[in-house]
Amino acid sequence: MSSSLDIPDPNFILLSSDQVKFPVHKPVLAMSSPFFKDLLSLCQPLDAELVDGLPFVQLSEDAALLNSLVSLLYPIPPIIPGSYEQVFALLAACQKYDMASIQSHIRAEIERGTFPAPAKAQAFRAYAIANSMSLSVEMERAALLTLGQPMTLEHLGDELRSFKGQAIYDLIRYRAVAASNNSKRKGNNKSNERRRLASGRRQ
């Protein structure tokens, strides 16, 4: 099965984990990713297997993810993931294949509201997912969303199962630092207000 993306005159195939073919151009891949640039620089054996008469590489990502990823390589309307979980998976793929410019573009689109982002009620799960994918930017953004929400066993429930390694410790530490900074800001604001009032009385 081939992707529905219309990419004319391809010379390479990305094959998804569910065996969907994504025709692409080697120069586009090489410019977007040092990983693929190195991969494509390797000599192709004369007896190498071909797909539709083209060299290919089998990837571990599924067709839904590659559909979005490939659409971001070309000047065509992007295929936007349907959930923040899928956006995180897309960011993780960019990280895996060293597609820094594509990853930055996706994050900019999240900021604009074009791509889905986790809601406050999804913050703890989003943090756990971002942690499992080593997405530090998304971890910090999700951690920020958890502020003001109780972090108790009763509140977290099944979300605790999603946390790995020292993710819980890191989140507790982040919340403590953020709370301290917030308290300092409030204290500074009160001090500034008192000085302003005192200055007004002297005048």
Which positions does each model-derived feature cover?
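Terminal end segments
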Residues: 180-203
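Aromatic/basic-lined ligand-recognition segments
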Residues: 169-171
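BTB/POZ (also called T1 in voltage-gated K+ channels) oligomerization domain detector
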Residues: 1-81, 202-203
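Residue-level detector of functionally special positions within alpha-helical transmembrane segments
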Residues: 25, 98, 134, 200-203
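Post-BTB helical module
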Residues: 68, 72-161, 165
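C-terminal alpha-helical interaction modules of replication/initiation AAA+ assemblies
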Residues: 164, 178-180
